[in-house]
Regions:
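Positively charged, small/polar-rich N-terminal and surface patches that mediate targeting and assembly
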Residues: 1-98
Length: 98
C-alpha cells in the first residue's frame, strides 16, 4: 500500500479531491489536517495556511490518482508525495475490496 501526502490551499479543495478519488474507487481513505507552511516562492519567503490531504491507496492506482489530483488541484506545482507502507493484513484486505 501507499500513502500520498498532498498539500492543498484549503479544506474545500482537499475534500473535493478526496471525494472524487473515493467515488472513482482509487483510494481507500482520506485524512485532512490543517497546517502552516513556509517556502520560497518567486524569490520571496512565504508563509501560508494550507491543508494536508493524506490518501491511503493501493500502489497500482498511483498513476491514476496522480492524474486526477493534477486535474483538480489549484496549484501550478502541486506536491504529490508517495510513501510506500506496510500495513496489517486486515486493513490491506479491506482496502483491496473497496
Amino acid at each position: 500500500m501507499i500513502l500520498l501526502y498532498i498539500t492543498c490551499k484549503d479544506n474545500t479543495e482537499a475534500k473535493k479531491i478526496a471525494k472524487n478519488l473515493l467515488n472513482k474507487k482509487l483510494i481507500a481513505c482520506a485524512n485532512i489536517f490543517p497546517i502552516e507552511s513556509f517556502y520560497n516562492w518567486k524569490g520571496k519567503l512565504t508563509q501560508d495556511k494550507e491543508v494536508v490531504l493524506i490518501l491511503k491507496a493501493l500502489d497500482k492506482n498511483y498513476k491514476k490518482i496522480q492524474e486526477e489530483v493534477k486535474k483538480l488541484h489549484s496549484y501550478d506545482i502541486p506536491f504529490i508525495g508517495k510513501i510506500n507502507v506496510k500495513v496489517n493484513k486486515e486493513y490491506e484486505t479491506w482496502a483491496k475490496n473497496k
